[in-house]
Amino acid sequence: MAHKKAGGSTRNGRDSESKRLGVKLFGGQEVKAGNILVRQRGTKFHGGENVGMGKDHTLFAKTAGKVKFEVKGPKNRKYVSIVAA
């Protein structure tokens, strides 16, 4: 009689859900207070003028205006600021 031995189980077959990180509003765009600018893990971007940071490092607008990205400082850090429109 033909018999097939039981196959071994695989260790693959899992994948985590994407976290939808990244820049949400780009340079020159108009924002309202409270708009999310960047979702990130750690401080890839730092908050500049009129930008707050949440406990998960999310950057958000504190006032209405235009988004401005800049690289400055001795460590060439990326800063996100809100300039009054």
Curated annotation (Swiss-Prot):
Keyword Ribonucleoprotein: yes
SUPFAM superfamilies: Ribosomal L27 protein-like
Chain residue ranges for the region called Disordered: 1-22
A single GO molecular function term of this UniProt record: structural constituent of ribosome
A Gene Ontology biological process term: translation
Pfam families referenced in this protein's UniProt entry, alphabetically: Ribosomal_L27
GO cellular component, one term: cytosolic large ribosomal subunit
Domain of life assignment: Bacteria
PROSITE patterns: RIBOSOMAL_L27
Keyword Nuclease found: no
Keyword list, A-Z: Ribonucleoprotein, Ribosomal protein
Coiled-coil annotated spans: none
UniProt record similarity statement: Belongs to the bacterial ribosomal protein bL27 family.
PANTHER family xref list: LARGE RIBOSOMAL SUBUNIT PROTEIN BL27M, RIBOSOMAL PROTEIN L27
Protein name according to UniProt: Large ribosomal subunit protein bL27
Source organism: Teredinibacter turnerae (strain ATCC 39867 / T7901)
